[in-house]
């Protein structure tokens, strides 16, 4: 059975970089998928779905639920790796509930933990506005993305805490410290 770890955090928390490094360090057993990268790749294809995704992401809004869930599940099932890291998911209560429902309806994948990389809003803002990745990285859109992240956060945290799946990692440290702690935690689950 595949082990799934969801990695959440504010825009600029470092969740994608952390997950990339962990999967690179453990390439035999760990696959990493960034929800954002999966959606950007689909958007770049300029298909009907891609254009729809672009319409939402360019405004900092959430992509429709069915498109995101379909994209996530496809990535998990197509992977040959035993441990799957997905960052940037869930970003809404609806996404959380939809994934929970899908995972409960199958026996190929088990959710082991939801890891939250916690950073202050100031740190997130400095990191996002200091990088240039596309049209979505300006101050107005950053604030919208923070709102989209923060609005459902307490409910998402409480849902996973009740299932004893929520883990917080301090994202205000060096990348080496964060990756080390997260990697040790993930690998502690064994088989």
Swiss-Prot record:
Give TM regions.
none
Q: One of this protein's Pfam families, by short name? A: ADK
Gene Ontology molecular function? adenylate kinase activity; ATP binding
Region described as NMP: 34-63
Q: Which reaction is the catalytic activity of this chain? A: AMP + ATP = 2 ADP
* Superkingdom of the source species: Bacteria
Function according to Swiss-Prot or TrEMBL: Catalyzes the reversible transfer of the terminal phosphate group between ATP and AMP. Plays an important role in cellular energy homeostasis and in adenine nucleotide metabolism.
Q: Which PANTHER family match?
A: NUCLEOTIDE KINASE
Give the UniProt family note. Answer: Belongs to the adenylate kinase family.
The identity of this protein, by name, is: Adenylate kinase
Q: Which organism is it from?
A: Helicobacter pylori (strain HPAG1)
Name of the coding gene: adk
